[in-house]
Amino acid sequence: MQQGLKGSIAGVVAAATLLAGGILTVPHAMALEADGQYYSSKQPYVAPSEATTASYSQAPEGYETVYTESMARHGSRGLSSYKYDALLMKMAEAAEADNGFKSDAIKSEFMKNLKAITAANVENGYGMLTGQGADQHQGIGARAYERSKTLFDNAAKDGGKIAYQSSGEARATESGENFARGFNAASNNKLANSTVTPADPAGTGEAAAFDKTPNTLYFHKSENPDGTEKTGEAKQRADDYQNFVENDAIIAGAEQTIAENEDVKTASHDLLSQIFTDDFLAKLADGTYAWYNTVDGTKGGEANCAPGADPSKDADACGAAKKKIASEYDAAMDLYNLYIIAADM
């Protein structure tokens, strides 16, 4: 675990020049390339080649497909909320006031890039699919039809129906809508109107075909994406899971070990020192500086929302106030997490 995280941070050190040169122009990562770049959890999904799909096993002789199911996570998205960009802007503003940038050119480029990626996420919607994410799921839907063409064609003739489900998270439903678009385009809309009526529709329009099933697909939190609360066994499972994540001694110990690892600290400093002065970083390291994701950067301050965003339409444009930068490690991880989202934008 320590080694994996250290590798992630060290990887950003090598990529810091790209960040300084323009975060929004990072080339899209391509999985399996010998010289490809890798972005951990934000590594974009790469569609299989025709040769790969042609190599998939067929049903054994004498057998035929009678049922198929596709379960997928959401596609490429923007930042989940206003947090990494928000906190790094707080840090940048403090550095500007304290002469903490290595040079005026670095300051100008860094702040320009921060503002640009915030603006891009405001325009796209925090946490929502990007065009790349929509394309991914349309392709998955089309390939699902081609893979089981006979099954679906027979279902269209025999009155069969497709059941669509979503966790209720907006980006998940949006992903499903794009899956359906790809599927229906590939099948010439043979089953476009042959869907199971949902017990709890995920929305209107295309989303109306999706049944919200958060007890299954969003089991890990007691509060559902639509703001309702789980009840009964579903709530107990969610509470047990959250208690495990937040209070398990092994997890806490592992996180502390990573944060206190000297190699990780060195990698964090090496990354940040390409942008900020040692004097400024020393104040972060000794506790002089700390920033919370609030309007004034203090603990308990007012909610901090992305410039130009409409919180009534995009609640995620106002970040969680508990998020903070209180160490070089925190800042390096925020910078890394901001950097890797570019591959999905």
Regions found by a protein language model. Give the residues of each.
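Secretory targeting and sorting signals
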Residues: 1-31
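Long, internal stretches of domain cores in catalytic or enzyme-like folds
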Residues: 32-345
